[in-house]
Amino acid sequence: MSGEEAPQASETGDNAIAMVTEATEELYRVRDTYFPRDPADKTSRIRTLADTALARLDSVPVEQRKSAQQRAMLEFLKGKILDVFPDYNKEAEDHLSKAVKLNPSLVDAWLCLGNCIWKKGDLVSAKNCFTLALSKGPNKKVLCQLSMLERSMSQVNIIGQEDQATLVDESIKHAKEAAMLDIKDGNSWYNLGNAYLTSFFVYGACEHTKLQNSLKAYQNAEKDELMNSNPDLSFNCATAHKYLENYERALHRFEAAASQDPSLGGDEEVRKIISVLDKLDSSVKKVRNKKLTSMALNLGEISLEPAYRGATVDSLSEGINTGVAVLAKVLLFIKHDNIAPLYCLLIDSNMCRFILSVFGLQFESVKEGDCVTLLAPNYREVDVSWKGKHCQFKLIRVDFAKQILINGRRPSLRQIACTSMISQNKS
């Protein structure tokens, strides 16, 4: 397509606008599915295709520019072609604005105008465009963009009446509606996965069910062959696995994302995970036995609620241990580069060393020397092999503040974390 010559002025009839439409669709197909290792190659190819599409548009004969609907369509196509690049384009906005004035029923023009205005930071006006588009009837593309915009709005908090969580809940709602309009459309499922992933962070990175819902949506997205080459899908799927502590799956997906689009930083995410695993593995193995004995003897007693019975780590089953409480001492706070979770090395009364991962609490909430009680502990044995490295340790995961007592007390409101993830504007 990039090598096509500009059409000649002799091209007349209804085919002229149809050919511009076809060229514009090809332009956006390349934008959304072409991911070379060098981003400059993509920019160059898109620019060539955009020039070809504009040349086709300029060649549309005068007789195909007479009615308001024809002029609206041509203004829309020109604005859409100019808006294909990531940065805001004033000329694109002008053409798209003319299109919706000439034909207020042109849904695609409202959608593109909203995307264009979003790029210059006017999120409220962008939302108005999407809302006007939806007033013409349900539309999966508009619903997806509205869902993305609501996530973006939740990060900058520009609407005082709507708090962050409400906006993200609306984002999930609109993403679901888009997916239900076409259950085979991978992009809609991908958008829903992103909405759940953002929701996990907005609600304090403490509800792993949101991560699981995110992965289910991504799995549905992958059923669409058009999504197989999307590096953002691989990267976001890897992110969900990372926070579910499915380390090997996360490593494989980040590596896949890095091979598809190096600019996303998948290689750096792999490095971070390996670094964390090394720290966790070595911390379990390197603590001196003398220190272990001293800490274990100083555990003391914590009175448990009747619903719980005391247990040690070695007696736990894989998964959630309902009705069980583990008393342990914090030996070491383990620093790392990610926003969550909080990692600590603990020891129980049997001198069993294990890693505690805590989601939803501020980093300073648990300190070395603290005595913690883990209620209904979610236990697993981590065993990861990756390119010659092998890490193995016992892990208890805490997703909610109500699952942990620190020195016999529930975490205070000040100790509960609130993290966030920025939504990317990707049409």
Question: What are the residue ranges of the model-derived segments?
Answer:
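TPR alpha-solenoid repeat register
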Residues: L74, A109, V142-L143, S188, ...
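Flexible helix-coil transition and linker loops at the boundaries of alpha-helical arrays
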Residues: A55-Q69, K98-L102, L132-V142, K176-N187, ...
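OB-fold (S1/OB) nucleic-acid-binding surfaces
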Residues: L331-F359
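Structural detector for short beta-strands of small beta-barrel domains
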Residues: E318-D337
